[in-house]
């Protein structure tokens, strides 16, 4: 029987020798694939797709059928936890995620209940079990959650935001309420990732999409502290499950992030991979960091830029190739194949 620990992805995460650099793609199950669009249309809307384990399983498997990827990522949304807390998640056409009951004052934060994660988000764990059963046995499955800070941003703003005025006002003027909210979310995220691990995921990733809007001290206090808490609790219970942290626009804080006890850091395209490796490569693996815009260019440009990312990381293990953020819906599927082939062809020379 195949030992999943021998997979390229898990070996690279643990900084063990590999024959080539593993690759997966953030949002690899997504709107750039015509087969995904067909299933989403059948589901009626994005949330129905997330809440239907069979359909979530199908779209998770689609990119694996099309491409030689080294891991699958559970198909879900980062806002399932706030939805389970009763905020009423919905997706407005062209606007992204919104809540019918955003947290409009400190009273709402005090009243917010920590949900029973196994019951309220059972559809996520059912999907994870089904995916693990149906997907290739030799490939790892990645589970994920939004970070407490990122979830709080959406919950207080009521959806996406350009300036995050409400949540930033909260941390400056109602510090205690902000910490109460983040603590409730940290407890929920820990329970959520624990249940995903029980359902069969082989690694977990915490997406801190909005950590980069904070000052350094506020990042430490309101984002990193809670991710640290989650990592410690997961590692206490599941020391062998790798944890990846990703703060978008957080390249200046890699040293702090590496101190949390996580196994790897995701880096976006604004971060120089060679200097990131010098700074924290002795402690953690690095995942990234091709600019997603490269996938909208021609074959020779894609190959050149893939080569640049691989050369920037350099020789040896500890690198998982990925984009610096999620793949965009306008990417031609054939360009993804060009990127993956380039990683397969160019990376072995760095692992001799």
Swiss-Prot record:
Subcellular location: Cytoplasm
Transmembrane segments: none
Pfam families for this protein: URO-D
One of the record's GO cellular component terms: cytosol
CDD domains: URO-D
Catalytic reaction(s) noted: uroporphyrinogen III + 4 H(+) = coproporphyrinogen III + 4 CO2
The keyword Ribonucleoprotein is annotated on this UniProt entry: no
Keyword flag Lyase: yes
EC number: 4.1.1.37
Residues carrying the site annotation Transition state stabilizer: 77
UniProt entry keywords in alphabetical sequence: Cytoplasm, Decarboxylase, Lyase, Porphyrin biosynthesis
GO BP annotations listed: protoporphyrinogen IX biosynthetic process from glutamate
Gene Ontology MF term list: uroporphyrinogen decarboxylase activity
Pathway: Porphyrin-containing compound metabolism; protoporphyrin-IX biosynthesis; coproporphyrinogen-III from 5-aminolevulinate: step 4/4
EC supergroup of this enzyme: lyase
N-terminal signal peptide: none
Binding-site list for substrate: 27-31, 77, 154, 209, 325
Record text on subunit structure and interactions: Homodimer.
Homology family: Belongs to the uroporphyrinogen decarboxylase family.
PANTHER family xref list: METHYLTETRAHYDROFOLATE:HOMOCYSTEINE METHYLTRANSFERASE RELATED (PTHR21091), UROPORPHYRINOGEN DECARBOXYLASE (PTHR21091:SF169)
NCBIfam families membership: hemE (TIGR01464)
UniProt function note: Catalyzes the decarboxylation of four acetate groups of uroporphyrinogen-III to yield coproporphyrinogen-III.
Protein name: Uroporphyrinogen decarboxylase
Source organism (scientific name): Legionella pneumophila (strain Paris)
